[in-house]
C-alpha cells in the first residue's frame, strides 16, 4: 500500500491540526504556513500538502501573497522530482504569473515581473529534470545568478537533487561510465567519489560505476499466466450460440 498523498513524517502537530480542520481556510493561518515553509527550507524537510494549502490561501487572499514563499515552495518541489509536486504548485498560481512577459498583451503590474520571471526559470529546471536532461540542468543552474538567488534559502538543494537523480538512475541501469555520471550529477573528483561511495553506496571499478542489483534495474522476464476455469469457458461458448431476444 502506497504512502498517502497528504502524509509528511516531520509535520508538526499544530500544522496537522490546521490541515485537518476548518482553520486551513482561515487567512489568519497564512503566517503559520509561511513560517512552516521557512522551516522546511532550513531543516531539509518537505510537506507538499501543507505547501499546497498555503498556495490555496494565496488564491483566495491575493493581498497576503509573499513572492519569496512561492518561489521557495517551487524550489523545494524540485527536490522531490519526478513527483508531480511542482506542477501541482504551478497550477495554483495566478495565470498572469505563468504567461511569458514577452507574450503578454500588456505590461505586468508592479511587482509581478520579478515573480513571473522567477517562476518561468524554475519551470525550465523542472522540465530538464522531468526529461532526465541532467547535464543541461546543472549547466542551466550555473548560467544565471538569479538561479543562485532562488535556491539560496533552500538548505542542501543541490545535494537533495543529486540524491533524487541517483535514485532515478539506480532504477534503470546497473553500470554507467564515471565520466557520464559526473555530468549527470554535476560534480567530479573527490567530491564525486565521496558521494558515490558514502551517499549512494555504489562502487567504482576501472572508471565504471557499479549500481547494486535492485528490483527496478534487474533484467528479468515477466511471464503472465491466467487460469480460466472450464465452466467459465463453456458459458462464453453458450452465449455465442444463443439467439438474441
From Swiss-Prot:
Coiled coil regions, renumbered to chain: none
GO biological process: formation of cytoplasmic translation initiation complex; regulation of translational initiation
Keywords (A to Z) from UniProt: Cytoplasm, Initiation factor, Protein biosynthesis
Domain PCI, first and last residues per copy: 46-227
Subcellular location: Cytoplasm
PROSITE patterns in the cross-refs: PCI
Domain of life assignment: Eukaryota
Molecular function GO terms recorded: ribosome binding; RNA binding; translation initiation factor activity
A single Gene Ontology CC term: eukaryotic translation initiation factor 3 complex
Assembly notes: Component of the eukaryotic translation initiation factor 3 (eIF-3) complex.
Entry's family note: Belongs to the eIF-3 subunit K family.
Function: Component of the eukaryotic translation initiation factor 3 (eIF-3) complex, which is involved in protein synthesis of a specialized repertoire of mRNAs and, together with other initiation factors, stimulates binding of mRNA and methionyl-tRNAi to the 40S ribosome. The eIF-3 complex specifically targets and initiates translation of a subset of mRNAs involved in cell proliferation.
Name of the protein this chain belongs to: Eukaryotic translation initiation factor 3 subunit K
Amino acid at each position: 500500500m502506497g504512502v498517502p498523498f497528504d502524509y509528511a513524517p516531520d509535520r508538526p502537530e499544530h500544522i496537522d491540526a490546521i490541515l485537518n480542520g476548518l482553520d486551513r481556510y482561515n487567512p489568519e493561518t497564512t503566517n503559520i504556513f509561511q513560517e512552516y515553509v521557512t522551516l522546511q527550507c532550513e531543516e531539509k524537510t518537505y510537506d507538499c500538502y501543507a505547501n499546497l494549502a498555503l498556495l490555496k490561501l494565496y488564491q483566495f487572499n491575493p493581498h497576503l501573497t509573499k513572492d519569496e514563499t512561492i518561489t521557495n515552495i517551487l524550489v523545494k518541489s524540485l527536490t522531490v522530482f519526478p513527483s508531480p509536486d511542482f506542477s501541482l504548485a504551478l497550477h495554483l498560481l495566478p495565470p498572469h504569473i505563468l504567461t511569458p512577459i514577452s507574450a503578454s498583451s500588456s505590461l505586468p503590474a508592479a511587482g509581478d515581473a520579478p515573480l513571473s520571471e522567477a517562476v518561468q526559470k524554475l519551470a525550465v529546471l523542472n522540465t530538464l529534470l522531468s526529461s532526465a536532461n541532467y547535464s543541461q540542468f546543472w549547466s542551466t543552474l550555473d548560467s544565471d545568478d538569479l538561479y543562485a538567488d532562488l535556491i539560496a534559502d533552500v538548505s542542501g538543494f543541490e545535494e537533495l537533487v543529486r540524491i533524487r537523480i541517483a535514485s532515478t538512475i539506480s532504477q534503470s541501469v546497473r553500470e554507467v561510465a564515471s565520466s557520464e555520471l559526473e555530468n549527470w550529477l554535476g560534480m567530479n573528483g573527490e567530491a564525486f567519489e565521496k558521494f558515490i561511495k558514502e551517499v549512494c553506496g555504489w562502487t567504482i571499478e576501472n572508471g565504471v560505476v557499479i549500481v547494486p542489483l535492485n528490483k527496478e534495474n534487474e533484467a528479468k522476464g515477466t511471464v503472465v499466466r491466467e487460469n480460466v476455469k472450464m465452466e467459465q469457458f463453456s458459458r462464453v461458448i453458450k452465449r455465442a450460440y444463443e439467439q438474441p431476444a
